[in-house]
Regions:
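Short, surface-exposed beta-strand/turn "edge" patches of beta-sheet domains
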Residues: 67-91, 261-262, 333
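Feature responds to low-complexity, polar/acidic, surface-exposed segments characteristic
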Residues: 90-115, 123, 128-144, 151-177, ...
Length: 359
């Protein structure tokens, strides 16, 4: 694969794996190459184990053409449960695992539960920081910025959407073409017939509705990978949002928060939106990305198997974890009494082996 010898390909991929993908069908013992998918796409997993120090939000699938030019695939992501970089393609050629360091680095996301998801959204140009070095992960996401992120993910041409119907969306605002696009496409309707409230924070049930509309209008069929959950605050979800919340939860794109609450009227934070964008990309490529280890929208870990939250003891890769018998949330960082015996769990949730306690 001479193309991989280019300076650009070496800089993007380094020593990470590369694959020359092809598709064939077998008939009568004879292999026939399939060169054209006729406008359809196929989901691909590139197996990969991140190197020490690599942040998974910065991992991409990259396409290398015959001249050695690299295309970074925005709609690709590393999924830890699948242990692979996932993406969709409509053609077969040379692909590899690339790494793009986001510069400048955000100084306010270190240790944040959504740090990798924030890097995913920022490195792909879906979300910007609130300054050159800050992301403000726990502040609210405005409606204008949210729709802008969706437009960027869809890859629209802003020049094609310079006029719109909302009187409170100024033509020179950065979000104007994206709001116009979303309205013309039927993804958003506005808070009234003529206003959008672009600078107002979006709440979680509004986010669910817009995401469901986005998927439908762009032709994505949302899977029902996870078992439906009845949230503790289900009665607080507006009637017009209930179906969207259920669809997003079952697909694995939106999750609850602590105490099994959805918090429908709560403001969607910038960290939550970054997380939703990453989940969406992974889920529409490979619905099974919703199984395995998953964080809820407060950053707590659960483990899903065949669409259901595992509860009690979990053995995974020769390590033991304790998942609450009611909520399924992983216990981490300290002593825990289980069935009359004491166990110690590290900060990553793994049980300390050979633990002896005289409590």
């Amino acid at each position: 694969m001479d193309a991989l010898r280019s300076t650009e390909a070496k800089a993007a991929i380094g020593t990470r794996p590369t694959y020359d993908l092809s598709l064939v069908y077998l008939s009568g013992g004879k292999e026939t190459p399939i060169a054209n998918l006729n406008g359809h796409t196929i989901s691909v997993r590139l197996p990969y184990t991140p190197a020490k120090g690599e942040q998974t939000g910065n991992l991409y699938a990259v396409y290398v053409d015959d001249a050695g030019k690299v295309e970074w695939i925005t709609k690709s992501s590393y999924n830890a449960s699948l242990k692979a970089v996932v993406f969709e393609t409509s053609h077969f050629s040379v692909y590899g695992v690339g790494y793009k360091t986001f510069v400048p680095a955000f100084t306010d996301i270190t240790g944040h539960w959504a740090a990798d998801n924030i890097l995913f959204a920022a490195s792909r140009g879906l979300l910007s920081g609130t300054s050159d070095t800050t992301f403000s992960p726990d502040t609210g996401m405005t409606r204008g910025m949210f729709v802008t992120a969706l437009g960027r993910l869809a890859g629209i041409n802003p020049d094609s959407y310079q006029t719109g119907k909302f009187t409170d969306v100024k033509a020179d605002a950065y979000y104007a073409p994206y709001v116009n696009w979303a309205a013309q496409t039927g993804i958003v309707e506005g808070v009234t017939a003529t206003t959008f409230a672009p600078d107002t924070n979006i709440n979680r049930e509004q986010m669910a509705v817009i995401m469901k509309n986005y998927a439908a209008k762009l032709g994505y069929d949302l899977p029902q990978t996870l078992k439906a959950v009845t949230f503790a605050d289900n009665t607080q979800i507006s009637s017009w949002a209930k179906d969207a919340v259920k669809s997003m939860q079952q697909a694995g794109i939106l999750a609850g928060k602590n105490e099994n609450k959805f918090d429908p009227k709560g403001t969607a934070t910038r960290a939550e939106v970054a997380t939703v964008l990453r989940r969406f990309v992974e889920i529409v490529i490979d619905p099974q990305a919703a199984n395995g280890w998953q964080q809820n929208d407060s950053g707590q870990w659960n483990y899903y198997r065949n669409g259901e939250s595992v509860k009690g003891w979990l053995s995974e890769e020769q390590k033991w974890y304790w998942l609450d018998k009611v909520t399924g949330m992983m216990f981490a960082g300290g002593w825990k009494q289980i069935d009359g015996k004491w166990y110690y769990f590290y900060a990553d949730g793994t049980m300390a082996v050979n633990t002896v306690s005289d409590r």
